[in-house]
């Protein structure tokens, strides 16, 4: 009986921790300011699209050769960053 209780406790813990991780990832897309997106995307080229309150990041920083650009390149695989836009738009 003790073994079943321990397994049940572990299962509940796993469920609760996975729920909180999914919640944290979903919150990253929602924004009200550009600063929130820069923090969530971990790059300076991110901004908040106020039409849908979603973080957007541009890849133009990766395409430049100028070493004086202060922007950090956005990491396209970063989960909390929202959607990509082309620098040609």
Swiss-Prot record:
Q: Please indicate if the UniProt record lists Secreted as a keyword.
A: yes
Give UniProt keywords alphabetically: Antimicrobial, Disulfide bond, Fungicide, Plant defense, Secreted, Signal
Q: List the disulfide bonds.
A: 31-48, 37-55
Record bears the keyword Secreted: yes
Where found in the cell?
Answer: Secreted
User: Where do the coiled-coil regions begin and end?
Assistant: none
- State the family it belongs to: Belongs to the DEFL family.
Q: What is this protein called?
A: Putative defensin-like protein 254
What high-level taxonomic lineage is stated for the organism? Eukaryota, Viridiplantae, Streptophyta, Embryophyta, Tracheophyta
């Amino acid at each position: 009986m003790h073994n079943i209780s321990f397994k049940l406790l572990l299962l509940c813990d796993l469920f609760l921790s996975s729920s909180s991780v999914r919640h944290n990832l979903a919150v990253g897309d929602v924004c009200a300011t550009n600063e929130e997106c820069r923090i969530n995307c971990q790059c300076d080229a991110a901004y908040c699209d106020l039409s849908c309150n979603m973080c957007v990041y541009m890849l133009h920083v990766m395409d430049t050769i100028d070493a004086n650009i202060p922007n950090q390149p956005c990491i396209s695989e970063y989960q909390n960053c929202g959607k990509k836009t082309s620098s040609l738009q």
